[in-house]
UniProtKB/Swiss-Prot annotation:
Coiled coil: none
Any matching Pfam family: Inositol_P
Name this protein carries in UniProt: Fructose-1,6-bisphosphatase
GO biological process: inositol metabolic process; signal transduction
Binding locations of Mg(2+) 1: 68, 84, 86
Keyword Magnesium among record annotations: yes
Necessary cofactors: Mg(2+)
Species of origin: Pyrococcus furiosus (strain ATCC 43587 / DSM 3638 / JCM 8422 / Vc1)
Keyword tags: Carbohydrate metabolism, Hydrolase, Magnesium, Metal-binding
Family: Belongs to the inositol monophosphatase superfamily. FBPase class 4 family.
Tree of life domain: Archaea
Residues holding substrate: 87-89, 171, 176, 195
InterPro entries cross-referenced by the UniProt entry: Inositol_monophosphatase-like (IPR000760)
Record note on quaternary structure: Homodimer.
Amino acid sequence: MKLKFWREVAIDIISDFETTIMPFFGNPDGGKLVKISPSGDETKLVDKLAEDLILSRITELGVNVVSEEVGVIDNESEYTVIVDPLDGSYNFIAGIPFFALSLAVFKKDKPIYAIIYEPMTERFFEGIPGEGAFLNGKRIKVRKTPDEKPSISFYSRGKGHEIVKHVKRTRTLGAIALELAYLAMGALDGVVDVRKYVRPTDIAAGTIIAKEAGALIKDSAGKDIDISFNATDRLDVIAVNSEELLKTILSLLE
């Protein structure tokens, strides 16, 4: 299963997403509760529809799958696909145009390909370990540290509140995979979530893409993040475009 194969799979899924899921954008019916996911979160109708769409394409390949809504499907394959069928489902249901679908492919325990697709802008982000990060086919990099204070996405329940005094502005956009993609293309200087809340499915693709764009990615203890193949782990994530910003944030979390 070469890179070209996985890109074609992703493009097929995106095409189906545009046709099947996008008509529900801003429709309250998409927010109907369907079930409780293995991670303990509520699964809305649109989450289930998006997951069913993606799983129908991926499970036929005989690979392992990790998804927020269904948990783990172990087919004893050397390939594992971690998916977030609808990153930012609240935004989607509410008609807020900031959401995405994300997919990360691993061979054994090594990432080999990741995509994040933002339907509202038709931005197609790709991360290819060892080759780089791309937006609609063009290489992207995190932006150099600006002369002014940085701008970050920041999620907290009180921990690290002093961080806001050391940045120019903060945003809480509600779709962390897409926010990591925005870090990769230079729209944000950092993405920080210290709620012990995000799951591997939320950040698998985003961390691959951001890292390939030059981002530094750690947990709140300053350790590398290990993306596990399950849907229930809860993580902190600190992804930034410079060593200086990383040191500042970690020092304020001590």
